[in-house]
Amino acid sequence: MLRKCALRRSSGKEGYPMLKFHSEQGEISVSSAVFSNITGMAATNCFGVKGMAYRSMTDGLVHLLRPEAMSKGVKVTYNDDHTVSIELHIVVENGVNIATVCRSIMSEVKYVVSLNTGVTVKAVNVCVDSVTV
């Protein structure tokens, strides 16, 4: 049974923030990259989502990310109450009800992240950056 979690910075080369759990058997550390990958997969499996988006800082344009780079469209924030908040940027298909797609993504991401990591998701914020034809 996981008892306590705390935020710490990793000492690895990537410098990803990590969520640390303590149990009777030892310690479990979960990188923010894990949350980003799980979130990206859950979001892109929802109906109406074309893919994850990334806004280039150089030209300001929105780019559709390849499946192997979808975590770039996700930002994970660790909260003081041992929960996470997730912001994701997506591209949707033309003709779908955007509000319904976003509600579906919010529900799916909360469920899948909680199921796979055991961490409570406080908020999921979905930003629709583009619509494809």
What are these language model-derived features?
Residues 2, 6-94, 98, 103, ...:
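Contiguous, often N-terminal, cationic amphipathic patches that form binding interfaces
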Residues 110:
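Glycine-rich active-site/cofactor-binding loop and its immediate structural neighborhood
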